[in-house]
Amino acid sequence: MVCTDVLGRIEREVIKECSPTLAGLKTGNLFNYRYDNISDFRKELASVNRKLNAKGVYVTFLKRNEKSALLYVFRPDRLEKDLSQPAVQNVLKTFGYTDYKVGASIKHLKQRVGENTCFPHEIGLFLSYPVEDVIQFIRQKGCNYKCCGVWKVYCDEAFSQKMFARYRKCTEVYLRVFDLSLIHISEPTRRVVI
């Protein structure tokens, strides 16, 4: 049995790092999660998935070692829509993606994360980053951007700044509510107007 303090810790981390995804504002979020042992981590991951899957949110690891895992928290329905866009498929094709279904694309992303020394930049397409910004990030090698927030912005700065503010506000609200013990991952999702 996993200690409830540990489950509270993973829940708080998911809320802290992934509130925009939990609220339905983004397709996915990514964060590094540290744990003490792999057995407890597997139980924590299973517990969080049991609570979130009913709400249409899933958690998987893209890479892990003995003490930490790179977790991807995502909404498969939104990811499916994102992956169906021709512009997204064109970018993914250049990185060896051939099947644009959710499961196959995540599997290929895991392979790319695991085998590359440098982070696969197409990951932004799995995180609701605008495709134009992902393309320019790759072309510009991360330089010459207009502004930087959740991602480096090359195109629509006003839109991106607005989204960054919404994501920050969402995270603040979700953390405040969680810290007041008014909501936990296992409770029904409440839409927060941001």
Predicted regions mapped to residue ranges:
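Short, extreme N-terminal leader segments that mark the start of a protein/domain
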Residues: 1-33
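Short terminal or interdomain "cap/linker" segment that borders an active site or interface and mediates
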Residues: 145-183
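A glycine-rich, hydrophobic loop/mini-helix early in the fold
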Residues: 44-101
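Hydrophobic/aromatic-rich, well-ordered segments within soluble, folded domains that form packed cores
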Residues: 120-147
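Internal catalytic-core helix/loop-beta-alpha segment
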Residues: 94-121
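Short, surface-exposed ligand-recognition loops at beta-strand->loop->(often short) alpha-helix junctions
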Residues: 35-43
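Short, flexible, solvent-exposed loop/turn segments with mixed acidic/basic and small polar residues
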Residues: 18-24, 59-63, 110-115
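Single conserved hydrophobic/aromatic residue that forms the stacking wall/gate
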Residues: 183-194
